[in-house]
């Protein structure tokens, strides 16, 4: 362990050091979020000596909970347990927890001591040091706050071993910012020379870069503790970043991701004013690229984005203030004009938002993504927003051959909601792709439905063929793999009314077919009678035989070698149930393996509990069709003799983003 300042320690496996600083307090509150609590509360209970005076409080995880509503219950808890001015708060978590814990300590009984134990890289190099503590106002980030220095800061780089990759990269964005804030470029060169060791979480290198970042930040904090002058330079990249976070409701981009883009914005402005050259800008871009951090700005409407930049706390007299630098490392705080902002953002017209909507038999889904256009090729860069609603558009369509009015109304309500979200993000009409699948194409009144949706939402629906659906599914899945991936894959999508199969590889599609077997269709055919569900063994056997008979059309596929990849709700739900997910985690699901045995286990669980109790990981709105869908899934594996499949989150929504759905 290294003492880098009187109150700041950096090292590995140094949590026990806390015992040296807790003896003089009558009560201790370990304040964290639910994710960190699950990982580390037990370790703290075994590490801290005076266990009878230690209390624990965990809030929900996320920037959206960094508000007064989340803090009031903490005050209540502290009052109920007789916390006094001689009590201590230990903030255990990332930037949100460090900010909130500091704010609580600054305001409870007009101030008590607190210790920061930052668990994310972002918090270790930023939020835990400097004494700025704050919570968010609904209209602006960090608007309600104070200045209060922690009693101690204990930085243990071992925490970074359990940090998700995205969060580590977010911290690197803020850490790299510090390398631009010093004229001495040795720190920047050290980072460039140790990229692989940093990525591999080498303790010695991590300790060095965290220490150096803290020294740079502490320099500015010490000469300007209340941010009246040079400390503002620490806000390099933050004017753009805070506006970007606000535009997307603090959900699409982590703080470090936004700051990385914001640094490039400030450097673009520095270039525009002739303070740096293109080579300097490109070197900066490349440094971020070494850590797979995207720094391209997004082409957003200036009439919505510029007002958000005006709300930054550096501003006054209605001026937008940001930080510039020159090639020698001199920093300056300056006003940026609206025409300069427009000129910079216009350089990124090929980096924009695109939306795709899938109107299925059972559900409607929306994906909004950041994409890049190069000539006519679209590259997916980032998921911005994703949603699913069970609308049951295809209710009884297999029997009646038309879409019921109440089903249309349910779907229309969902599409009106999606229209509002799309409009909020100012997505151009040409970048809204909406397609309908099996239920719509099987109905006799599809033209009425399509016209009604357009009249009331201005969303243009393309009713696509099974072949087209298979094509965009494949394109969505294959985007997950590197270009040098050579294996054949067979992608299947169990929808509500049909299941699409597409065989191919990175070079293209070889075969595709759409079969009229789907989770809604099988349920209505074998398990639903007069609105009552009957999953008897006899009905299940009939359903399995029906699926097997339909799968015979895949005889040509059976002779080939391929990896089997499943997409869409029936398949992804199997993983969320296996993992007992209370909150759906698409990153954990994407490209995970799912075995035949696990599918069998899930099917038994569904049959046993479908009408009795909630099943963790199963959306209650999907339970009506999950047994039928799981039977189809299991029969597909059995037909091809596969012990497992790969589960992909990328499907026709992604394919539509990349390829569109118009016939070419």
Curated annotation (Swiss-Prot):
GO terms for biological process: amino acid biosynthetic process; aromatic amino acid family biosynthetic process; chorismate biosynthetic process. Its EC number is 4.2.3.4, 3.6.1.-. Binds 1 divalent metal cation per subunit. Can use either Co(2+) or Zn(2+). Gene3D superfamilies: 3.30.420.40, 3.40.50.1970, Dehydroquinate synthase-like - alpha domain, Exopolyphosphatase. Domain 2. Pathway: Metabolic intermediate biosynthesis; chorismate biosynthesis; chorismate from D-erythrose 4-phosphate and phosphoenolpyruvate: step 2/7. It is found in: Cytoplasm. Zn(2+) binds at residues 174, 238, 255. The keyword Metal-binding applies. Residues 353-664 are annotated as: GPPA/PPX. Monomer. This is Bifunctional 3-dehydroquinate synthase/phosphatase. It comes from Fusobacterium nucleatum subsp. nucleatum (strain ATCC 25586 / DSM 15643 / BCRC 10681 / CIP 101130 / JCM 8532 / KCTC 2640 / LMG 13131 / VPI 4355). The gene is aroB.
């Amino acid at each position: 362990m290294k003492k880098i300042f009187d109150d700041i320690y950096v090292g590995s496996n140094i949590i026990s050091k806390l015992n040296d600083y807790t003896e003089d307090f009558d009560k201790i509150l370990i304040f964290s979020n639910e994710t960190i609590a699950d990982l580390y509360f037990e370790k703290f209970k075994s590490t801290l000596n005076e266990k009878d005076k230690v209390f624990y409080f965990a809030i929900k995880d996320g920037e959206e909970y960094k508000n007064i509503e989340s803090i009031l219950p903490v005050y209540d808890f502290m009052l109920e347990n007789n916390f006094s001015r001689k009590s201590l708060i230990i903030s255990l978590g990332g930037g949100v927890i460090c900010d909130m814990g500091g704010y609580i300590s600054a305001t409870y009984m007009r101030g008590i001591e607190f210790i920061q134990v930052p668990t994310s890289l972002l918090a270790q190099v930023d939020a835990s040091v400097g004494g700025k503590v704050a919570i968010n106002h609904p209209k602006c980030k960090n608007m309600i706050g104070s200045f209060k220095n922690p009693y101690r800061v204990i930085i243990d780089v071992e925490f970074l071993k359990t940090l998700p990759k995205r969060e580590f990269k977010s911290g690197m964005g803020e850490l790299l910012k510090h390398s631009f804030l010093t004229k001495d470029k040795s720190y920047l060169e050290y980072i460039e020379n140790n990229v692989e060791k940093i990525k591999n979480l080498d303790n010695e290198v991590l300790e060095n870069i965290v220490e150096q970042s803290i020294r740079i930040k502490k320099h500015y904090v010490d000469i300007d503790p209340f941010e009246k002058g040079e400390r503002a330079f620490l806000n390099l990249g933050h004017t753009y970043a805070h506006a970007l976070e606000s535009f997307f409701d603090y959900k699409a981009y982590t703080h470090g991701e936004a700051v990385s883009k914001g640094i490039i914005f400030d450097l673009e402005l520095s270039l525009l004013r002739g303070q740096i050259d293109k080579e300097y800008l490109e070197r900066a871009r490349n440094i971020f690229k070494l850590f797979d951090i995207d720094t391209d700005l997004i082409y957003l409407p200036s009439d919505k984005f510029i007002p958000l930049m005006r709300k930054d706390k550096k501003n006054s007299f209605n001026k937008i203030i940001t930080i510039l630098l020159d090639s020698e490392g001199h920093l300056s705080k300056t006003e940026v004009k609206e025409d300069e902002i427009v000129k910079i953002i216009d350089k990124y017209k090929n980096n924009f938002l695109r939306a795709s909507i899938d109107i299925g038999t059972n559900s409607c889904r929306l994906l909004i993504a950041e994409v890049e256009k190069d000539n006519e090729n679209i590259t997916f860069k980032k998921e911005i927003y994703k949603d699913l609603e069970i609308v049951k558009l295809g209710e009884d369509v297999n029997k009646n051959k038309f879409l019921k009015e109440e089903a249309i109304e349910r779907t229309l309500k969902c599409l009106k909601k999606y229209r509002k979200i799309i409009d909020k993000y100012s997505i151009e009409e040409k970048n809204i792709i909406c397609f309908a699948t099996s239920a719509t194409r099987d109905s006799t009144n599809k033209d009425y439905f399509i016209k009604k949706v357009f009249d009331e939402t201005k969303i243009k629906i393309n009713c696509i063929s099974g072949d087209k659906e298979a094509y965009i599914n494949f394109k969505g899945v294959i985007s997950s793999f590197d270009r040098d991936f050579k294996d054949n894959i067979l992608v299947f999508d169990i929808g509500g009314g049909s299941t699409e199969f597409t065989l191919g590889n990175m070079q293209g599609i070889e075969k595709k077919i759409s079969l009229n077997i789907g989770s809604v269709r099988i349920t209505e055919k074998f398990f639903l009678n007069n609105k009552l569900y009957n999953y008897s063994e006899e009905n299940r056997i009939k359903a399995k035989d029906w699926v097997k008979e339909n799968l015979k059309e895949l005889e040509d596929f059976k002779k080939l070698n391929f990896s089997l990849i499943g997409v869409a709700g029936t398949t992804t739900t199997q993983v969320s149930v296996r993992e007992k997910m209370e909150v759906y985690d698409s990153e954990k699901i994407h490209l995970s393996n799912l075995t035949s045995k696990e599918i069998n286990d899930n099917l038994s669980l569904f049959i046993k509990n479908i009408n009795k109790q909630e099943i963790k990981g199963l959306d209650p709105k999907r339970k009506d069709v999950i047994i039928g869908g799981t039977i189809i899934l299991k029969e597909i594996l059995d037909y091809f003799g596969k012990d497992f499949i790969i589960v992909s989150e990328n499907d026709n929504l992604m394919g539509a983003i990349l390829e569109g759905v118009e016939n070419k």
